[in-house]
Amino acid sequence: MPSPGTERDGKIFRHRLSTRLWHWINAVAVIVLLMSGLTISNAHPRLYWGHYGANFDAAWLTLPRFPGWATIPTGYNLALAREWHFAFAWVFAFGLLFFMLRALMNGHFRRDIALGVKDVVPSHLWQDVKRHLRLNFETPGGGYNLLQKITYSLVLFVLLPLLILTGLTLSPGMNAVLPWLIDLFGGRQSARSIHFICAGGMALFIAVHLVLVVLAGPINEVRSMITGWFRVKGEQS
């Protein structure tokens, strides 16, 4: 298998097999988690802070009831939704662990995602923002641009771990094994609120990600995530 950065016939090898597998498996897992999570939310669409929250407590946010077409299962079935959620949560968690270990071993983090000293200079960030506003997403060598690095770092090292840890906190079985998690997040209801906020952040990330894929050229972007090869600008057919 070629190394990332290898050039051939106007294309650059961009994604290793481990990255591509994780991307598509994770995409399925996240969709199932979000849709089953909406069913779970429908059971009590109110969010609280602290250890307790019930019908007569003051909620900081009241959520809408989500329609059947947006939920798994499509009909209201809380027990089945929890089974779907729990099963794919393990796929999600172990998939993230596998990806992180592989990315550390093969240099993906260091080469493509890690932020250097020059990356955090405000002028560089502003230049990257202006390039995005002009719909110019190209970078030398076909690598990730600065906004991608920042976003992927926040998602991989903040958003996804928070989703997993707060999800574990909401599991009564895990409370017996890891009772300190409840105190870490300031109570079960606080963990539930943080979990929902992070899930909303994940949904927003996916929406923006899909829009940018379309704007950057969906055929080339999707092909690179299937085959690993990304056609550079000026060589596209």
List each language-model region with its residue ranges.
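Membrane-embedded alpha-helical bundles that constitute the cytochrome b-like, heme-associated redox core
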Residues: 1-237
